[in-house]
Curated annotation (Swiss-Prot):
This is Thymidylate kinase. It holds the Pfam family Thymidylate_kin. Homodimer. GO terms for biological process: dTDP biosynthetic process; dTTP biosynthetic process; dUDP biosynthetic process. GO terms for molecular function: ATP binding; dTMP kinase activity. HAMAP family: Thymidylate_kinase. InterPro entries: P-loop_NTPase, Thymidylate_kin-like_dom, Thymidylate_kin_CS, Thymidylate_kinase. Phosphorylation of dTMP to form dTDP in both de novo and salvage pathways of dTTP synthesis. 5-bromo-2'deoxyuridine monophosphate is also a good phosphate acceptor. ATP binds at G10, L11, E12, G13, A14, G15, K16, T17. Belongs to the thymidylate kinase family. Its EC number is 2.7.4.9. One of its GO terms (cellular component) is cytosol. It comes from the Bacteria.
């Protein structure tokens, strides 16, 4: 089977780390052991610097919405061109913690940046490059935020209002409904059921992939 790019998406507290473990277990059960992990923003030296700026800000300066989204795309293209595409080209599978869908949901939905501008940015920066499969972990924002707060100190984006995350979730659901490559998982279930749902969705998807 040719290498694939699988992305895990969702709001804060949705359980992306646990999902990654489940995805890896399913892939390895299929004999897929050459797996590269990525996170966004981040994943290259420059992208990690941008991650710090996006997550923490700098010296109290107000970070405008457009500056934020441009930094996200700068970090993303560095990761795609320097890590993800080379990994796929050499036959590795890539499992990513967030990708472009996050920007479409958080900046397009949460921040309210024009959807045409967001689509134009995506197409200009990434061209036709897209994940092969996206697992979107859906849960009520209040539940996710409670989980995030229980982990400790919140970053700049995690401190946004509940209304911001409601708008973000709404955009996630809107985009997932119109894209067959996005599988929505109910992440409000007990962790065992979430893992079972992920395993089932991924296993079914794998059976539909062309062998090498």
């Amino acid at each position: 089977m040719n290498s694939k790019f699988i992305v895990i998406e969702g709001l804060e507290g949705a359980g992306k780390t646990t999902t990654r473990d489940t995805v890896v277990a399913v892939l390895r059960a299929q004999g897929i052991n050459d797996i590269v992990f990525t996170r966004e923003p981040g994943g290259t030296p420059l992208a990690e610097k941008l991650r710090d700026l996006i997550k923490q800000g700098i010296d109290g300066e107000v970070l405008t919405d457009k500056a934020e989204v441009l930094m996200l795309y700068a970090a993303r293209v560095q990761l795609v061109e320097n890590v993800i595409k080379p990994a796929l080209a050499r036959g590795s599978w890539v499992v990513g913690d967030r990708h472009d869908l996050s920007s479409q949901a958080y900046q397009g939905g949460g921040r309210g940046i024009d959807s045409q501008l967001m689509a134009s940015l995506r197409d200009t920066v990434l061209g036709e490059f897209r994940p092969d499969l996206t697992l979107y972990l859906d849960l009520p924002p209040a539940v996710g935020l409670a989980r995030a707060r229980a982990r400790g100190e919140l970053d700049r984006i995690e401190q946004e209002s509940l209304a911001f995350f409601e708008r973000t979730r709404a955009r996630y659901l809107e985009l997932a409904a119109s894209d067959a490559s996005i599988k929505t998982i109910d992440a409000s279930q007990p962790i065992e059921q979430v893992s079972a749902s992920i395993s089932q969705a991924l296993a079914q998807w794998l059976t539909n992939q062309e062998p090498v």
